[in-house]
């Protein structure tokens, strides 16, 4: 069985501040002292430089831990007349290692199709970023027992456009739409069932990828349910929304992941 290092990625969405970043790093510097889990901060783009500076300023205090920076989105284009967009190269220049791709809010609110998501996945890797690919089903799809069908479709388009080996440098986040921002989380058993399906799906085309890829759970993860979720054999950590805005809760989640 592969030894997959757990990851906790904090997606601030359109929230947070430079002060929140400073508060997080103040707690990280005294409490985050080992590398048994990887921590990724994904603030709004306007705060990437603030987080980068804090990473540099706290380099000595964070020695021995793995705290990284990621972005919440990127353009599928390298450059051009795309007002308001940010390219993969720009994110790389800012110090990002990761970027969230295909979050349900981007798909739903901004009309990002699976084809666009696949293009963004490619753009991220082209510029040396590791994509955190989000997949997940809606409430009606789950009620209709179409969860596996929906997720397979979302995965297959990325595979068709980028190849299976592209997942050698990728993270997957399962985020059931009915649990994102609702306060209603999937049960550990529900999460494990879907994560196992994702791993099996990828194993069918590459046993190595299937065994080694990290699959995060995202959807109302809190310190009260994280231990049971992270204890599941195919759950490798969490993509955290609301709880990432509370420094104490987020640090608790990081600590739980380190002991998972």
UniProtKB/Swiss-Prot annotation:
Record localization: Cytoplasm
Taxonomic lineage from the root: Bacteria, Pseudomonadati, Pseudomonadota, Gammaproteobacteria, Alteromonadales
Protein family membership: Belongs to the triosephosphate isomerase family.
Keyword Mitochondrion: no
Database matches in PANTHER family: TRIOSEPHOSPHATE ISOMERASE
Enzyme Commission code(s) on record: 5.3.1.1
One annotated GO molecular function: triose-phosphate isomerase activity
Description of how the protein assembles with itself and partners: Homodimer.
Function: Involved in the gluconeogenesis. Catalyzes stereospecifically the conversion of dihydroxyacetone phosphate (DHAP) to D-glyceraldehyde-3-phosphate (G3P).
Catalyzed reactions: D-glyceraldehyde 3-phosphate = dihydroxyacetone phosphate
Pfam families for this protein: TIM (PF00121)
SUPFAM superfamilies from the UniProt entry: Triosephosphate isomerase (TIM)
Organism: Shewanella sp. (strain MR-4)
GO biological process, one term: glycerol catabolic process
Name recorded for this polypeptide: Triosephosphate isomerase
Keyword Cytoplasm belongs to the record: yes
């Amino acid at each position: 069985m592969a030894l997959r290092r757990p990851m906790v990625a904090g997606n601030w969405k359109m929230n947070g501040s430079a002060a929140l970043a400073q508060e997080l790093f103040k707690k990280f510097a005294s409490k985050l002292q080992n590398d048994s889990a990887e921590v990724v901060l994904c603030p709004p783009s306007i705060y990437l430089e603030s987080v980068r500076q804090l990473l540099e300023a706290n380099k000595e205090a964070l020695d021995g831990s793995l705290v990284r920076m990621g972005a919440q989105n990127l353009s599928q284009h390298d450059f051009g007349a795309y007002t308001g967009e940010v390219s993969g190269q720009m994110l790389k220049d800012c110090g990002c290692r990761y970027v969230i791709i295909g979050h349900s809010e981007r798909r739903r609110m901004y009309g990002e199709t699976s084809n666009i998501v696949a293009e963004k996945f490619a753009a991220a890797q082209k510029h040396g970023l590791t994509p955190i690919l989000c997949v997940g089903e809606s409430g009606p799809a789950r009620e209709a027992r179409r969860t596996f069908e929906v997720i397979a479709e979302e995965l297959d388009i990325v595979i068709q456009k980028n190849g299976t080996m592209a997942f050698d440098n990728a993270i997957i986040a399962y985020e059931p739409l009915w649990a994102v921002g609702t306060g209603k989380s999937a049960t550990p058993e529900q999460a494990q069932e879907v994560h196992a399906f994702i791993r099996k799906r990828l194993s069918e085309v590459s046993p190595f990828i299937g065994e080694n890829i990290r699959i995060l759970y995202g959807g109302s993860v809190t310190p009260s349910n994280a231990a049971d979720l992270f204890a599941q054999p195919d759950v490798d950590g969490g993509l955290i929304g609301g709880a990432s805005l509370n420094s104490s809760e987020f640090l608790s989640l990081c600590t739980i992941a380190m002991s998972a």
